[in-house]
Amino acid sequence: MDGIKYAVFTEKSIRLLGNNQYTSNVESGSTRTEIKHWVELFFGVKVIAMNSHRLPGKGRRMGHTMHYRRMIITLQPGYSIPPLIEKRT
């Protein structure tokens, strides 16, 4: 799992879950085809489309943080990605 870092939960990403679209941050060097292949292989789903944009790194007092890419992955109807962490009761 070199490509995908973690899932993103913002107001927009939660709204997009209703359209069967999932948002996650990925490594900046990974390509769309690598991410698509990994998602289809690991989760067993079919990907229709992928949108991506690069987010800038943040400046620090000394140095900076690396930039990263955010992918919005659209799945075919009938497929979904299950939550990776179960809620504790």
Swiss-Prot record:
Single Gene Ontology MF annotation: structural constituent of ribosome
InterPro entries: Nucleotide-bd_a/b_plait_sf (IPR012677), Ribosomal_uL23-like (IPR013025), Ribosomal_uL23/eL15/eS24_sf (IPR012678), Ribosomal_uL23_CS (IPR001014)
Keyword rRNA-binding assigned: yes
GO biological process terms held by the UniProt record: translation
Location(s) in or outside the cell: Plastid, Chloroplast
Job of this protein: Binds to 23S rRNA.
Similarity comment: family membership: Belongs to the universal ribosomal protein uL23 family.
Protein name: Large ribosomal subunit protein uL23cz/uL23cy
Organism from which the protein derives: Calycanthus floridus var. glaucus (Eastern sweetshrub)
Species lineage: Eukaryota, Viridiplantae, Streptophyta, Embryophyta, Tracheophyta
Gene giving rise to this polypeptide: rpl23-A
